[in-house]
Amino acid sequence: MLISTRMVEPFTIAANVTGQVNPTENDIALIYGAGPMGLTTVQALKGVYNVKEVIVADRIDERLEMAKESGADWVINNGQQSLQDFLDEKGLKPTLIVDAACHPSILQEAISLASPAARIVLMGFSSDPCQIVQQGITGKELSIYSSRLNANKFPVVIGWLEKGLIDPDKLVTHTFNYHHVTDAIELFEKDQRHCCKVLLTFSE
C-alpha cells in the first residue's frame, strides 16, 4: 500500500479526465499513448467505470504490454498497422477517445475514427497548430474536452485505492534511493521502452 499511496497524484489526472466525460459501461474507449497518463486512464476506465472495451494505441510494444497489464482489452502498434484498419477489422467504433500521446496530428484522426456523438479528450500542450475539418465535428455532433489539472481529485483517487479499483503498483517499473536521483532521471529520460514510473526512496 505504501507504493500505491505515493502514486495517487498521477491518477488524479485520470480522475479529472473521466470526471469530465462520465464514462459508461457501454463505452468503447480508444486511448492514444501508453505512457503514465494513458495507463492511469486505462485503469480508471476498466476498474472504476467498467467500460466495455478499451483500446490502446502506441508505437512502443513494451508500453503496449503495460497497457494489457493495466486492463486494456485491445492494443495496437499504430506505427506498424493502420488504426482505422484495425478498428474496422475488429468492428469497433470508439465512443470515447483520449489523446494521452499529445501530438497535434492526432485530433483530426480521432475525429475521423469517432462514432457519432462521441467524446474526445485532449491532454496535450503542443503549441504547434493542428488542422481539422469542422464538418467532421459538427456532422457527428462530437464533444471535445480538455484536461490539464487534477481539479482536487486526490480524495477521489484515495477512494479508488481504498476500494481496490486501481493498482498503481503496475506502473512502477524502477525504484532508486534518493542518493541516486541522477541515475533515476537519466533512466527515465533515456529508456522509454521499459521505464514508466520511477520512485525515489528516502531511507538511509
Predicted regions and their residues:
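Mid-domain Rossmann-like dinucleotide-binding core that forms the NAD(H)/NADP(H) cofactor-binding site
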Residues: 1-80
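Short alpha-helical
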Residues: 12, 36, 61-62, 81-82, ...
